[in-house]
């Protein structure tokens, strides 16, 4: 269960981090 949950959230988190980095 947790593995699937993390796998589902990881991409969203990565996208969010990239967006924050772009905003600087």
Swiss-Prot record:
Distribution of this protein across tissues and organs: Expressed by the venom gland.
GTP-binding listed as a keyword: no
Source species, domain of life: Eukaryota
Key words of the record: Antibiotic, Antimicrobial, Secreted
Entry's Gene Ontology BP terms: defense response to bacterium
Keyword hit for Secreted: yes
Coiled-coil residues: none
Main localization of the protein described in the UniProt heading: secreted
Functional description taken from the UniProt entry: Antimicrobial peptide active against Gram-negative bacterium E.coli MH1 (MIC=2.5 uM) and P.aeruginosa PAO1 (MIC=10 uM) and against Gram-positive bacterium A.globiformis VKM Ac-1112 (MIC=0.6 uM).
Family: Belongs to the ponericin-Q family.
UniProt name for this protein: M-ectatotoxin-Eb2b
């Amino acid at each position: 269960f947790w593995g699937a949950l993390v796998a589902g959230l990881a991409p969203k988190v990565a996208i969010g981090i990239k967006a924050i980095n772009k905003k600087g």
